[in-house]
Amino acid sequence: MPIIIPQDLPARRILDAESVFTLGDADARRQDIRALQVVVLNLMPTKVTTETQIARVLANTPLQVELTLIHTASYQPTHTDPEHLRNFYSTFDQIRDRQFDGLIVTGAPVETLPWLAVDYWSELTTILDWSREAVRSSLFICWGAQAALQHFHGIEKQTLPAKRFGVFWHHLRDRSSPLVRGHDDDFLVPVSRHTEVIAAEVLAQSQLQILAESSEAGLHLLWDADQHRTYLFNHPEYDADTLDREYRRDREKGLPIQLPLNYYPNDDPNQVPTVRWRSHAQLLYTNWLNYEVYQPLSR
């Protein structure tokens, strides 16, 4: 089934070129199908890239999904064409009276800031509180996961001595969740973080389950079954060249950045990276849609 996105959204052209089944919102309205309603709070400066990555991993399921994109009103994005935001995004106030089947909150490049120093922190916590009643299931990514953990559970992020950067092996710790149904015991995931959450603090919260982690990269996937909240600290949705673009961007800015580990063939940044995480990414998002978003609705 298709992913329903605005007719002229740049992501649609990209996904159509990849033979990903998309459907424009105007065409979808002519069908008598109740699509799953998923709202995406996109906090990334690279909005087009991020919305494309998320649409791609949500598109390959038997379920029809309609995306609603929102951005913060308390902070005006500076790296995105204002016309793109006007045409394809809403603010929270414009959608707060609606009910959604799913919520996705992306990461954001504000990891090292204290929570209250983030311009949109108050707005974000309002959205998180709203989601308790207005959203069936939530998925939080990277900094979004850390922010939600702090808000709902009081667990603080910790700054790493150096950026954790590369493609790391992860291991399933708990198979009881349908989120990891069909996963291999060990799998690769792109990681790009300056901060982390400590496992011992998570284990102190009885309602949180650690589903997957890495001996090198730390926690990857947490699940709060009762509240239908999923916390994903890394980036299985990343494109083949995302870490490469981040590496070259930081080098051009003169920032301290090491070569992403386990990424370039022979650790040579002149070679094209090989994607070794795509199937895990697709399975995780498919499981989230099926078991956390759709099946509770159908009971």
UniProtKB/Swiss-Prot annotation:
The record marks E111 as: Important for acyl-CoA specificity. GO terms for cellular component: cytoplasm. Transfers an acetyl group from acetyl-CoA to L-homoserine, forming acetyl-L-homoserine. Its EC number is 2.3.1.31. It is found in: Cytoplasm. Keywords: Acyltransferase, Amino-acid biosynthesis, Cytoplasm, Methionine biosynthesis, Transferase. PANTHER family: HOMOSERINE O-SUCCINYLTRANSFERASE. GO terms for biological process: L-methionine biosynthetic process from homoserine via O-succinyl-L-homoserine and cystathionine. InterPro entries: Class_I_gatase-like (IPR029062), HST_MetA (IPR005697), MetA_family (IPR033752). It catalyses: L-homoserine + acetyl-CoA = O-acetyl-L-homoserine + CoA. It is an enzyme of class 2 (transferase). It comes from the Bacteria. Pfam families: HTS. Disulfide bonds: none annotated. The record marks S192 as: Important for substrate specificity. SUPFAM superfamilies: Class I glutamine amidotransferase-like. One of its GO terms (molecular function) is homoserine O-succinyltransferase activity. This is Homoserine O-acetyltransferase. The gene is metAA.
